[in-house]
Amino acid sequence: MIIIFLGPPGAGKGTQGKKIAKKIHLPHIAIGDIFRAIIKTSSKDAEVINSYVEQGKLIPDEIVNHIIKNFLSSSDYKKGYILDGYPRNLEQAKFFESFVTEKIKVIYLNVSDELLIKRILGRYSCKSCGKIYNDYFLKPRIDKICDVCKSSVFEYRKDDNEEVIKERINIFKTETYPLIQHYKNNDDFYMIDGNKNEEQIEDHIEKVLKIN
């Protein structure tokens, strides 16, 4: 089974995707994490991807498709997986559907622009283990100490500023809304109210996916 999490930046795709992945024992694949790992290398792909990320622009389809197809060719993903951040538009969806045969379920997290901006501006992560926190909604239990690994070193993403965030939201509306309409014809398409709190969103997703 393949589960695709769709939604604008800051919708909580990564948070919810990881939770569901853990409960149903499927690998969680975040295209953003893949790109950030590539950026840390000195490859030509890193230079190309970084130029788009710094401007808050979406990476061209041919680059994204090539990377994701190669990544999914691993035997680790033969039994299914959860995708976070891919596909982002109709062209990517058509490419993806051309080489996968498994049943696809789609979870769309619908969130207001105002809440998205607040979530993203307050977002930071533990530099050691990657645990995500938020200045407004999810601080560590002990101030400046990671709940998971106890590190005291945190980092904000450099592309998380209000101007870039608004541009990313606008790009999402232009590029991804047609994809939402495409998947609405799928019996396994589920729209989730992403304005609710983390636990309420998780409960709703579990209900539609029939996870006990």
UniProtKB/Swiss-Prot annotation:
Binding site residues for AMP: 36, 57-59, 85-88, 92, 157, 168
Gene3D superfamilies per UniProt: P-loop containing nucleotide triphosphate hydrolases
Keywords: ATP-binding, Cytoplasm, Kinase, Metal-binding, Nucleotide biosynthesis, Nucleotide-binding, Transferase, Zinc
BP-aspect Gene Ontology terms: AMP salvage
Domain notes: Consists of three domains, a large central CORE domain and two small peripheral domains, NMPbind and LID, which undergo movements during catalysis. The LID domain closes over the site of phosphoryl transfer upon ATP binding. Assembling and dissambling the active center during each catalytic cycle provides an effective means to prevent ATP hydrolysis. Some bacteria have evolved a zinc-coordinating structure that stabilizes the LID domain.
PANTHER family: NUCLEOTIDE KINASE
Protein name: Adenylate kinase
Protein species of origin: Rickettsia bellii (strain RML369-C)
